[in-house]
Curated annotation (Swiss-Prot):
This is Peptide chain release factor 1. Peptide chain release factor 1 directs the termination of translation in response to the peptide chain termination codons UAG and UAA. Gene3D superfamilies: 3.30.160.20, 3.30.70.1660, 6.10.140.1950. GO terms for molecular function: translation release factor activity, codon specific. The gene is prfA. The modification N5-methylglutamine is found at Q236. It is found in: Cytoplasm.
C-alpha cells in the first residue's frame, strides 16, 4: 500500500492544481479547455475524497492511541478504544476502495459500442439463438437507459439472424458489455425437433468500442458503396428514394449498412464513421502480443471462438465458464437481467488486477 499512497500524494497535488485552474478566468472563458479540466477533476474526485478521509481517520487513530497510552481517566480511554475499533474497520474498507479506484482504467470504458452477433454452429437453431441474444441485450440496454440502433442484419427464414450488428449508445456501455465477447452456447430442444432431443448450438458475439475520431485513413478505392431503398418490417419499402447505404471495406470484408438516418448523405456519414471504427478495431486486434496479454489478465482472451457461456434451457441454468459462475435463472437472464453476471465479471477482473498490484508492491 505504501507505493499506492505515494502515488496518491501526487494525485492529490494534481487535483488541487486542476481546481485552481478551474477558478482561473482565462480557463473559464475557454469552454473546451474548461470542459476537459472539469472532466479530469470529476474523474479524480472520488479517490481524492476517500484518500482525504483515509488520512483523517489515520490521524484520529493516532490521536486516540496517544490518549490510551497517557490518559488516566478510564472512561476516556474506553471511549478512545471504541472509536479506534470503528475507525480501523473504516480504514480497512477505505484501503480496499482506494485500491480499486487506483486500478488502471480501460480507456474505452466510457465509449459506445458496436455489437455483432452471428449464428455459428447449429444452422437454423443457431440463428434463432442469435436473435434471442439480441433481444436479451436490447432488454438489458433498456434497463440501463441505453439506446440500441440497427446497423446491419442478415435475417433467416425461420425468424433468426445469420448475422446482426447494432450500435448501443449510453453511459459506460463498453465497460459493461466488453465481457460479452466470445462464443455463447445454447442447449435446448429446437422447435423443429419432433423427438424432444436436446441440441447444442452456438452464436458468437463481438463487441467493439465506437471511436468518434479514428486516426485511420481509408482509401476510397478500398470501399464499395451500394445505395438502396430503406425497408421496414417484413421488407416493405418505406422510402421511395435510395437513401440507405451499404459500405464494404474490400481488404477486410467488413460491411456496414445504415438506413436509420433521414437522408442518404446522413446515412453515408454515419456508415463511414462506423466503418472506420470497425476497420480500426480490426487492425488493432492484429497486433495481438500486447492485446492478448492484457485480455488474458482480465477475463479470457475475448476471442470470438472462445466459449464463454452456456445457456441450458431444460435446467433453466446459465454458466459463465471464465469465472465458474452458475445461475439457475436462465429465464430472467434472457429477459435482460444481466447485472449479476456482469458484476461478477467486473469483480473477478478487479481481483486479478489487485493481486497483480500487490505483487508489484511486495
Amino acid at each position: 500500500m505504501d507505493k499506492v499512497m505515494a502515488q496518491l500524494e501526487g494525485l492529490v497535488a494534481h487535483y488541487e492544481e486542476l481546481q485552481e485552474m478551474m477558478a482561473d478566468p482565462e480557463v473559464i472563458n475557454d469552454t473546451k479547455r474548461y470542459m476537459e479540466i472539469s472532466k479530469e477533476e470529476a474523474d479524480m474526485r472520488e479517490v481524492v475524497q476517500k484518500y482525504r478521509k483515509y488520512k483523517s481517520d489515520i490521524k484520529e487513530i493516532d490521536d486516540n492511541k496517544e490518549i490510551i497510552s497517557t490518559e488516566s481517566d478510564n472512561d476516556l480511554v474506553e471511549m478512545a478504544k471504541e472509536e479506534n475499533s470503528e475507525l480501523e474497520k473504516e480504514v480497512a474498507e477505505l484501503e480496499d476502495e482506494i485500491k480499486i479506484l487506483m486500478l488502471p482504467k480501460d480507456p474505452n470504458d466510457d465509449k459506445d459500442i458496436i455489437m455483432e452477433i452471428r449464428g455459428a454452429a447449429g444452422g437454423d437453431e443457431a440463428s434463432l439463438f442469435a436473435g434471442d441474444l439480441l433481444r436479451m441485450y436490447e432488454k438489458y440496454a433498456e434497463t440501463q437507459g441505453w439506446k440500441v440502433s440497427l446497423i446491419d442484419s442478415e435475417p433467416t427464414e425461420v425468424g433468426g439472424y445469420k448475422r446482426v450488428a447494432v450500435m448501443i449508445t449510453g453511459d459506460k456501455v463498453y465497460s459493461k458489455l466488453k465481457y460479452e465477447n466470445g462464443a455463447h452456447r445454447v442447449q435446448r430442444v429446437p422447435v423443429t425437433e419432433s423427438q424432444g432431443r436436446v441440441h447444442t448450438s452456438t452464436a458468437t458475439v463481438a463487441v467493439m468500442p465506437e471511436y468518434e475520431q479514428v486516426d485511420i485513413d481509408l482509401d476510397p478505392k478500398d470501399i464499395r458503396v451500394d445505395v438502396y431503398r430503406s425497408s421496414g418490417a417484413g421488407g416493405q419499402h418505406i422510402n421511395k428514394t435510395s437513401s440507405a447505404v451499404r459500405m464494404t471495406h474490400l481488404p477486410t470484408g467488413i460491411v456496414v449498412a445504415m438506413q436509420d438516418q433521414r437522408s442518404q448523405q446522413q446515412n453515408r456519414e454515419k456508415a463511414m464513421q462506423i466503418l472506420k471504427s470497425r476497420v480500426y478495431d480490426y487492425y488493432e486486434s492484429q497486433n495481438r502480443d500486447q492485446y492478448d496479454a492484457k485480455r488474458k489478465e482480465s477475463v479470457g482472451t475475448g476471442d470470438r471462438s472462445e466459449r464463454i457461456r452456456t445457456y441450458n434451457y431444460p435446467q433453466n441454468r446459465v454458466t459463465d465458464h471464465r469465472i465458474g459462475l452458475t445461475l439457475n435463472k436462465l429465464d430472467r437472464i434472457m429477459n435482460g437481467e444481466l447485472d449479476e453476471i456482469i458484476n461478477a465479471l467486473v469483480l473477478y477482473y478487479q481481483t486479478q488486477q489487485l493481486e497483480k498490484m500487490a505483487e508489484e508492491n511486495a
